[in-house]
Amino acid sequence: KEVLNFYSKDALKEIFDNARKICGNLPLAANILYAINDYGRVVRDACEAGANIIITGAGIPTNMPEFTKDFPDVALIPIVSSARALKLICKKWQRYNKIPGAVIVEGPLSGGHQGFKYEDCYKEEFQLENIITPVIEEAKNWGNIPVIAAGGIWDKKDIDKFISFGCAGVQMATRFIGTFECDADPKFKDVLLNAKEEDIVLMSSPVGLPARGVKTNLQFSIENHTAPKVQCISNCVAPCNRGHEAKLVGYCIADRLGAAYKGDVETGLFFSGSNGYKIDKIISVKELMEKLTKGE
């Protein structure tokens, strides 16, 4: 059956219930984009559903604590790409008497939307290893907020490097697509298994930021004006302006990401970090964690 891209509190609750069955009493996090419409409602719904942590990127969440005041034990973790952004967040959060539980610093090799201009994604000064230290120094000014590195981290060597810089941990996403447990359609995984390094590119997005993904048939159909028609149903992200930006770039991001998740190779948008082409076989999360911790 066709599923429209509306937000559903019941669906969110079901996702949390399923995740809770797997993780038990361990901390459970929700990643909620600041750019979505009804951001505050979704944050509150996630807290009600049992989130222990809320992670937010796609904007600078200066009022994030406003929506969790009834849930004081929920840790709030913003995603930033500069020390300046962290300083602004911490200053704004003073009125809520709150500081971030941690901060994620995402460099320009990550999959999906970037916190940089297109040309800056290629400049040395904006690479993760060069933006991480100023954020760590800024974090010390607010009580040693734990700093988590993200974007292009692939193996134990990368993990060890950023831990040595003073990071408390790392965030990884793309490599976990190549696991049996990842719930994306097998055809999504095949796209990465078959991708070459040059296939993973930066592209335009209705959100107004460069986004990294695998160049597939969707990009060719956009160029040839044969991509699926843009019909804004849910008004999901504010920068898209009810589908106006989607029509300019040639695709609806919610529809195309949904198509990729369901394995539609013809019309799907397959986000991936810059190292996605390195996935060469599907393994278990257990095996992957052993590789990441033992360096195999």
Enumerate the language-model features and the residues they cover.
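Conserved active-site-proximal phosphate/metal-binding subdomains
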Residues: 110-148, 154-296
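Active-site entrance/lid segments in N-terminal catalytic domains of soluble metabolic enzymes
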Residues: 1-142
